[in-house]
Amino acid sequence: SAASDVYKRQGFSIVLVKDISLLDGCKIGHFNFIKCPCLKMSESAMIGNLNFIRGNFSLELREESMIYMQNKITSSGYSFHDVTFVLGKYASIQVAHLFDVTDNIKIGDNTLFAGVGTQVWTHSFYLEDSGKGRHRIDGSVSIGNNVNISSRCIICCGVKIADSIIIGANSCISKDLKSKGLYVNQELRFIEFDPAEKMSSMICQKSIGKLNIYKK
């Protein structure tokens, strides 16, 4: 049966999924917690051990991709469209990385999250100049093919990274990377920034009490 077939491919893990598809050779290891509406794993895809995956998003692992160990993939409580986390063919997420899937995350083929401790964010907040006002900004993250991301990087909301890029350790990526090559962090510098002006070009998706949620 389909249930027994899934059981043969799963170690000692908790998997709470409404729609699940596991193709030949894929595997879920031990001590994972997975709770999401949809899980699709293509041929020889793997979820290793001790991963925590929970949220209102669909998870798709393409051929021979891997989420290895101790990674955390979650979403915030509110999303306003169908959200998907896609891991491309032969792509690999190694150890103890964090992904916020409030909006879509797409990771290209043969892309590597190396080392430990990288964070990928698909939402952020703008605070008003005074008072209690704060506004959530959602933005999908797209990472191309053959991208190598080193330990403890931060990839911010709405960023797009082109193919064949290397990102050095401890880098903060707050804007699109369009040309292939090596990127490393720079010295701290001041940038003029007005949240109100920035939000004026965005669409407010919803207001919850005093919190307005915008789409980047």
Range-by-range predicted roles:
Residues 4, 63, 109, 172-173:
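Short linear motifs in intrinsically disordered
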Residues 120-121, 168, 174-175, 191-193:
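Conserved acidic donor-binding loop of glycosyltransferase catalytic domains
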Residues 1-7:
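Short, small-residue-biased leader/transition segments that mark boundaries at the very start
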Residues 161-184:
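C-terminal/domain-terminus segments
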Residues 197-216:
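Charged, low-complexity C-terminal accessory regions
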Residues 8-16:
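Extracellular beta-sheet-rich ligand-binding/adhesion modules
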